[in-house]
Amino acid sequence: MKQKFKRAILYARQHRANQEVNESLHRLVDFLSTQDIEIFQDSDTAASFELKAPVLPREKMGAKHDLIIVVGGDGSLLSASRMAIKVNTPVIGINRGRLGFLTDILPQDIESHLGPVLNGQYNEEERFLLHTKIYDKENSYFEGDALNDVVLGRGSETHLIEFDVYINQQLVSHYRSDGMILSTPTGSTAYALSAGGPIMHPQLNAIVLVPMFSHSLSSRPLVIDGEAEIELYISKSNETDLRISCDGHESRVVKPGQKVAVKKNGNRLRLLHPLDYHYYDTLRSKLGWESKHQG
């Protein structure tokens, strides 16, 4: 039997404030009230929803028996992950989004699937995040974390951008493209997949670099060691500013001549699943793959 939980922190993003999310949050409160669980909400949740639960400041999260319950889609869980790794608190998701690669529990299954989890019946896996720094000469002026991907892209202009990629201080290539996606295995079924990247099992210790519309027929996705340190040097020949984004949320300007450094974050996300969760079932369901022919 694994760890049982005594406190639940409900998390929902402000811009996901719709009736469906609201219904699931209230259903959670009603259910958790019957399970001898202390119920709290995050400050983001309290800003958009009226729940009968006190706000737990983030600096007070991280007790041994805490569990963060995310209501929303994968984007909501991505946002919660950056909070969760700082307090080493496990996360589980109620899917109120579209695909739901990370949010396992369907709204109608809250009681039947979450109940066993609260009592220690679950699978736990660790997912790593990428930590990004932007440097102006020797000083960094931005740091961000991404569970899915870090994306270097064009600003407001529509022409190709130029940059050099180094791995462990060794030059890989000079690129002329629309940008570059640096993805974790978790993010390999997200934006990187749309750009032609491979699907990687989430327990792989690897990072994939996926060029976006490269001006070279030989430019292909590159899978590298997860411990590698990646540097993107922005060419001074770029006539406009570029942008770096972490999981599509945190976005910052990168100027010609600057450097972006990306490596694995030392903290891991503790992601929980119900006992009947299977990764390949999720892939088959979410991506519309065929099941075994019956007949």
Curated annotation (Swiss-Prot):
Protein name: NAD kinase
Gene name of this polypeptide: nadK
GO biological process, one term: NAD metabolic process
Function: Involved in the regulation of the intracellular balance of NAD and NADP, and is a key enzyme in the biosynthesis of NADP. Catalyzes specifically the phosphorylation on 2'-hydroxyl of the adenosine moiety of NAD to yield NADP.
Family: Belongs to the NAD kinase family.
GO cellular component, one term: cytoplasm
Catalytic residues (UniProt): 74 (proton acceptor)
Organism: Legionella pneumophila subsp. pneumophila (strain Philadelphia 1 / ATCC 33152 / DSM 7513)
Catalytic activity: NAD(+) + ATP = ADP + NADP(+) + H(+)
EC number: 2.7.1.23
Family matches, as InterPro entries: ATP-NAD_kinase_N, ATP-NAD_kinase_PpnK-typ_C, NAD/diacylglycerol_kinase_sf, NADK
Primary location class: cytoplasm
Gene Ontology MF terms: ATP binding; metal ion binding; NAD binding; NAD+ kinase activity
Residues reported in the UniProt entry to bind NAD(+): 74-75, 148-149, 159, 176, 178, 189-194
TM ranges: none
Top EC group: transferase
